[in-house]
Amino acid sequence: TDPPIHIASLXRS
């Protein structure tokens, strides 16, 4: 249900 967008953002941080 959660889009893997926030996950990519974390990795980007």
From Swiss-Prot:
The keyword Magnesium is assigned to this record: no
Annotated GO MF terms: amygdalin beta-glucosidase activity
Class in the EC hierarchy, top level: hydrolase
Superkingdom of the organism of origin: Eukaryota
Keyword Hydrolase carried by entry: yes
Description of post-translational modifications: Glycosylated.
The reaction(s) this protein catalyses: (R)-amygdalin + H2O = (R)-prunasin + D-glucose
Keywords: Glycoprotein, Glycosidase, Hydrolase
This enzyme's EC code(s): 3.2.1.117
Subunit field text: Monomer.
Protein name: Amygdalin beta-glucosidase II'
Organism expressing this protein natively: Prunus serotina
